[in-house]
Amino acid sequence: MPLSTSLLGKKSTYKDSYDVTLLFKIPRINNRNELGINSNNLPFYGVDVWNTYELSCLNKNGKPWVGVGTFYIPTDSENIVESKSFKLYLNSFNNFVVESVKELERIILQDLSNVTHAKVTGRIFSINTKVEFGVPSGKNIDDLDIVCNNYGAPDNSLIEYEDVLVEEEINSNLLKSNCLVTGQPDWGTIVIKYKGKKLKYDSFLKYLISFRNCNEFAEQCAERIFTDIKNAISPDFLSIYIVYARRGGIDICPYRSTDKSYTLPSDKRFIRQ
């Protein structure tokens, strides 16, 4: 189905009962073709981490339960889920009776797996769970004194490097793009770990800032950045992790890595989540 038929950017009515048909799928292949990514031979591994903060149902006595959820959609899934449709879908459980939280978890994981055509994993837990905030790992490059004048479209020609090999981790809180459909801002913290030619911090920060008025989904921004770095420095190893600020009760955190046996940099939320 074309994106124009989705609920994103439109006035919507919340359903009174559980409705799996609310989930709207978007094929990954469309955006990947634009980036020159072969969907049959992906240059990366990873997941999209979805943290959801509006989750409720009724127990068998009609008493409400509230919680939060974390779900992991593999990068090799055929589809992603449009975020507003996921929000409406989750809220369709508000008056739905389930035997247990585990049953709710099973239903959601099965529905997401069916829509994305991949095995989605995750968990649901109580809002009374203690949560600690983390900070981005690596060297922060945001305090560099640079002049920026490119906000029209991501400009990979800004990526420069030094002719020296390094293994390092850097981060920035200055990534911003806009939702492809609504134009609402997506604020992101990006953590990059790589082994290869040393990125010049000043030019790379300008590159990240050039996304400021870019209209793309979070997942496509992540894959564009990964592809641009890979093409620029041909690293022996590369991973990127973008932690986006919460919007509409959901935050999306794409992770991409050249390492098949990857581990996520941190399971702690950052301050903007």
UniProtKB/Swiss-Prot annotation:
Reaction equation(s) it catalyzes: 7-aminomethyl-7-carbaguanine + 2 NADP(+) = 7-cyano-7-deazaguanine + 2 NADPH + 3 H(+)
Any GO BP annotation: tRNA modification
Domain of life the protein comes from: Bacteria
Cellular localisation: Cytoplasm
Keyword Hydrolase among record annotations: no
Cytoplasm is among the record's keywords: yes
Major place of residence: cytoplasm
Subunit structure: Homodimer.
Role description: Catalyzes the NADPH-dependent reduction of 7-cyano-7-deazaguanine (preQ0) to 7-aminomethyl-7-deazaguanine (preQ1).
Protein name: NADPH-dependent 7-cyano-7-deazaguanine reductase
Organism phylogeny: Bacteria, Pseudomonadati, Pseudomonadota, Alphaproteobacteria, Rickettsiales
Gene symbol of the encoding locus: queF
